[in-house]
Amino acid sequence: RKRGSQTYTRYQTLELEKEFHFNRYLTRRRRVEIAHVLCLTERQIKIWFQNRRMKWKKDHKDESSSSNLSANSEN
């Protein structure tokens, strides 16, 4: 059963981003609350956060590797 990709409204995206800014991981309780407020399923919230964490990791990958390099070069 293949699902089409979900498109989120501007409001939903904004709220999810705001939540992510404060917390990269959600408790089940918080996920239920957000799902209710944004009229999304828990599954959609869970997957949005998983995808967002991957994007965050990718965006911050270079920063951590470059700071590691400078720390190593001092030895």
UniProtKB/Swiss-Prot annotation:
Origin superkingdom: Eukaryota
PROSITE patterns: HOMEOBOX_1, HOMEOBOX_2
Molecular function terms from GO: DNA-binding transcription factor activity, RNA polymerase II-specific; RNA polymerase II cis-regulatory region sequence-specific DNA binding
Subcellular location: Nucleus
DNA-binding region: 1-60
InterPro entries (alphabetical): Antp_homeobox (IPR050296), HD (IPR001356), HD_metazoa (IPR020479), Homeobox_CS (IPR017970), Homeodomain-like_sf (IPR009057)
Keyword Transcription annotated: yes
Cellular component, GO annotation: nucleus
Keywords: Developmental protein, DNA-binding, Homeobox, Nucleus, Transcription, Transcription regulation
Principal localisation: nucleus
One GO term (biological process): anterior/posterior pattern specification
Family to which the UniProt record says this protein belongs: Belongs to the Antp homeobox family.
Functional summary from the UniProt entry: Sequence-specific transcription factor which is part of a developmental regulatory system that provides cells with specific positional identities on the anterior-posterior axis.
Protein name: Homeobox protein Hox-A7
Native source organism of the sequence: Salmo salar
